Structure formats: structure tokens, C-alpha cells
């Protein structure tokens, strides 16, 4: 599983434009084979900063998304006039577990939190 962590700082007066672009792209995400989920968060320490966290089955699905023409157009707009700054991190998920599904939890955690 791949996590894409996209931090963005929209330019002054461009908050709504950023949200419009993100909303227009969301239906396209669901068309990508290998897309799992996406959520958007607003920073508590810097209310101007937004984080988009998406999960993908593999790097091929991320590449398909990255190269989708609508997404390339959004990237161009973002870099051109919507963003003051951004940072993108792409990471491999080592483990994925929760309160009830403990399959991938480390053995020492399973002993304590059974």
C-alpha cells in the first residue's frame, strides 16, 4: 500500500479556488484502479495549511493518477497561481492495523493489546 501525503498552502485569496479544483478532481479518483481512499485535513497550528492524505494499492495506481490529464491541469494551476507552497511525500505503508483488525500489529503489541 502507498500513502500520498500532500501538504498545501493556498495563496491568499485562493482558498476557494483550491477547494473547487479538489472537488472537481475527486470523482476522477474513483475511476483509478487501485485508489483506496482520500481525506482532507486542515492544520490546527496553521489554519492556512491543508493536508490531503490518500491511499493507493501500488505505485502503478499512483502513476496513473499523477499522469491523468485533469490532474496534470490541476498541478499546473496549483504551481502557477493557486499555491504559495506545497510538499508531497509518497511512502510505503509498513503496517496497517486498527483496534479490531490486528492482523498486521507487531507481536509485542498483540500481547499487550489483545
Functional labels for PLM-detected ranges:
Residues 1-50, 59-67, 83-114:
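Short S/T/G/P-rich N-terminal loop/turn motif that feeds into the first structured element of a domain
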Residues 74:
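Conserved short loop/helix modules at catalytic or binding sites
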Residues 79-80:
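Short secondary-structure boundary/capping segments
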Amino acid at each position: 500500500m502507498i500513502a500520498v501525503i500532500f501538504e498545501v498552502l493556498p495563496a491568499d485569496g485562493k482558498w476557494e479556488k483550491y477547494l473547487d479544483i479538489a472537488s472537481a478532481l475527486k470523482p476522477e479518483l474513483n475511476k483509478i484502479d487501485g485508489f483506496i481512499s482520500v481525506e482532507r485535513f486542515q492544520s490546527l497550528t496553521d489554519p492556512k495549511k491543508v493536508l490531503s492524505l490518500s491511499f493507493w494499492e501500488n505505485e502503478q495506481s499512483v502513476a496513473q493518477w499523477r499522469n491523468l490529464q485533469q490532474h496534470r491541469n490541476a498541478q499546473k494551476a496549483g504551481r502557477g497561481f493557486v499555491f504559495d507552497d506545497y510538499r508531497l511525500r509518497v511512502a510505503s505503508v509498513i503496517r496497517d492495523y486498527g483496534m479490531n483488525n490486528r492482523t498486521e500489529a507487531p507481536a509485542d503489541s498483540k500481547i499487550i493489546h489483545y
